[in-house]
């Protein structure tokens, strides 16, 4: 039996509320050469029954239940290890694909551009008080390592959530780093972008649902995510290429954030980064930061965000 072109991967844990809408959006895709894999991480709600019903009607949908709860990152890696497709498409249980051609359009970018290691579409958010992050207004191919630096300059994950992305299985076989939970997505994007370029589509092909009960929201609000940021920077700033590529803006953003959040805990790292940013340049970046804050708030207010 030939392997499918793409694997749709859905890690599940107590997702009964939004799971049917998620699965319906995946089954509506016009990209047919795919498998759909769901890994239930010991749900205590009706998720398993929902999956069972869908699997009975769709032969290309396969699922299993982990013998014990593994946690978000480890369950995500179970999906990767089970996948057979050339391309991997995560769709989280709360999310949905907005367009029937979502997978087709992202896959076309990887087909056309062998040097691209990660493709993503524009972010669409569902949820009260949501504010979408717009990377840029132009579809195109962007240097992978430059995308990492740009994200660190803005202290933001410019790629977005897994539901927005598509990537090659061979470049992701390491899996998500299980030292991270709140930072797991961005760390994986960096792992992929060290291997190739980034393809960006301005179309809103998928939607990320924001609500307080989701696992990622709980982790993002925790002290642990701040600690993961520090851990990530300790790992990545040890890479010679990042030290060489670091801009003044990136260094200032990380020194400022880590110092504010961690103080003495981050002193060794922030002192090292400060040694690569001469005093006058640090002061200049600080003045730009202070001067730009009111204008940034005004711009977001005028844009309705």
Q: Which stretches of residues belong to each language-model region?
A:
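Glycine-rich, basic loop-to-helix element that forms the pyrophosphate-binding segment
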Residues: 66-83, 96
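Short aromatic/hydrophobic "clamp" motif used to bind/position activated sugar donors
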Residues: 88
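Short, well-formed alpha-helical segments that are part of the catalytic scaffolds
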Residues: 14-28, 99
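Short loop->beta transition adjacent to catalytic acidic/histidine clusters or analogous donor-positioning motifs
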Residues: 3-6, 27-38, 46, 59-62
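Conserved nucleotide-sugar donor-binding catalytic segment
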Residues: 8, 121-123, 127, 133-135, ...
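A conserved acidic beta->alpha catalytic loop
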Residues: 40-49, 68
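Conserved donor NDP-sugar-binding/catalytic core segment of glycosyltransferases
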Residues: 100-134
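C-terminal subregions of glycosyltransferases and related glycan-biosynthesis enzymes
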Residues: 1, 153-155, 187, 194, ...
């Amino acid at each position: 039996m030939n392997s499918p072109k793409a694997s749709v991967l859905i890690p599940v844990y107590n997702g009964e509320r939004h799971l049917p809408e998620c699965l319906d959006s995946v089954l509506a895709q016009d990209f047919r050469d795919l498998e759909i894999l769901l890994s239930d991480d010991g749900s205590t709600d009706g998720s398993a029954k929902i999956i069972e019903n869908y699997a009975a009607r769709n032969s290309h949908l396969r699922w299993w239940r982990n013998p014990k709860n593994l946690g978000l990152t480890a369950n995500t890696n179970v999906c990767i290890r089970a996948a057979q497709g050339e391309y991997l498409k995560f769709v989280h249980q709360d999310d949905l694909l907005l367009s029937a051609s979502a997978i087709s359009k992202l896959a076309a970018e990887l087909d056309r551009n062998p040097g691209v290691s990660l493709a993503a579409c524009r972010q669409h958010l569902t949820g009260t008080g949501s504010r979408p992050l717009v990377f840029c207004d132009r579809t195109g191919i962007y240097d992978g390592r430059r995308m990492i630096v740009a994200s660190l300059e803005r202290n933001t994950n410019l790629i977005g959530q897994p539901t927005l992305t598509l990537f090659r299985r061979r470049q992701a076989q390491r899996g998500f780093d299980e030292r991270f939970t709140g930072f797991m997505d961005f760390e994986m994007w960096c792992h992929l972008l060290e291997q190739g370029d980034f393809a960006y589509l301005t179309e809103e092909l998928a939607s990320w649902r924001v609500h307080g009960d989701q696992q990622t929201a709980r982790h993002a609000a925790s002290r642990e995510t701040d600690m993961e940021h520090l851990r990530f920077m300790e790992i990545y700033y040890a890479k010679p290429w990042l030290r060489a590529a670091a801009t003044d803006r990136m260094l200032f953003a990380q020194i400022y954030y880590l110092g504010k959040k961690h103080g003495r805990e981050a002193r060794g790292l922030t002192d090292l980064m400060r040694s690569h940013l001469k005093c006058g340049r640090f002061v200049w970046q600080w003045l730009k930061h202070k001067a730009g804050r009111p204008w940034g708030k005004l711009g977001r207010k005028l844009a309705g965000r």
